[in-house]
From Swiss-Prot:
Residues 90-94 are annotated as: Nuclear localization signal 2. InterPro entries: Herpes_UL16/UL94. This is Cytoplasmic envelopment protein 2. Residues 26-35 are annotated as: Nuclear localization signal 1. Disruption phenotype: UL94 deficiency mediates HCMV-induced transcription of type I IFNs and downstream antiviral effectors leading to impaired viral replication. It comes from the Viruses. Keywords: Host cytoplasm, Host nucleus, Host-virus interaction, Inhibition of host innate immune response by virus, Late protein, Viral immunoevasion, Virion, Virion tegument. Belongs to the herpesviridae cytoplasmic envelopment protein 2 family. Plays a critical role in cytoplasmic virus egress. Participates in the final step of tegumentation and envelope acquisition within the host cytoplasm by directly interacting with the capsid. Upon virion binding to target cell, a signaling cascade is triggered to disrupt the interaction with the capsid, thereby preparing capsid uncoating. Additionally, antagonizes the viral DNA-triggered antiviral immune response by targeting host STING1 and preventing its dimerization and trafficking.
Amino acid sequence: MAWRSGLCETDSRTLKQFLQEECMWKLVGKSRKHREYRAVACRSTIFSPEDDSSCILCQLLLLYRDGEWIICFCCNGRYQGHYGVNHVHRRRRRICHLPTLYQLSFGGPLGPASIDFLPSFSQVTSSMTCDGITPDVIYEVCMLVPQDEAKRILVKGHGAMDLTCQKAVTLGGAGAWLLPRPEGYTLFFYILCYDLFTSCGNRCDIPSMTRLMAAATACGQAGCSFCTDHEGHVDPTGNYVGCTPDMGRCLCYVPCGPMTQSLIHNEEPATFFCESDDAKYLCAVGSKTAAQVTLGDGLDYHIGVKDSEGRWLPVKTDVWDLVKVEEPVSRMIVCSCPVLKNLVH
């Protein structure tokens, strides 16, 4: 008996986009005739299963039969269907301290297909043995941003730009941006210099500026929307199935309070922003401004510190490095968080 499956044109484009752009695939089984992959995705705005969509478990069988690739797709334990495609490109991603992952891309639209069997997928196991994207991973893969490149990344302003400039997307809080490029995502953010991190940093959290400003201003009150975990993160390595608690390793954090002036509640992380004992407020806007601001402009164009009277104080600059993280780690960070993913997809 032949099993047929197909999609309308709109659904085909949406599913293809989801499988290619929002999933990092783990190889869980193979034979001479097939490969089986698994991915764990967070909530998506373009693809939503019928049941709880806060965590999307994706299982995919890849077959090559009669000159055509066949994709059999299962989502959250429910078989979604099988589809034909002209070409499949599998890109292996080896990342330090992490298991090998794959990115899949499909040549041409997903079309109807016919198979003579009902696909069976491997039993799903879930484990917390992998720590995911840790500070060690970030410091290993990140690169310092040269000044000439930083000057070409526009983060504020519109109007006429140099033809070499590119506009980045601001990610929530302070000091983090994403630049979508044809070759993939590039994350730019400020992070504590490595020597300072090793000597006095929290070795579990990624010490990004956005994380530390959120920690410094967190009021800690139950029910505070700024301080409460949105409970939508997933494990980007696909080892753990389900939503994971916040581990301080994302770039989705925002200050607790107005972006222009958030009260300091926790002194320890606040010391990374200002030397003065008079520091009262942290600001996710700069003490200086211009019609157009690039990453090459000084730190005081991006953040600020105020005293109790609202006067600007000098910002610490020597403790921060402007770094960039590229594919595939950049995509893993974005696609493990529904907040970041919604900003860029």
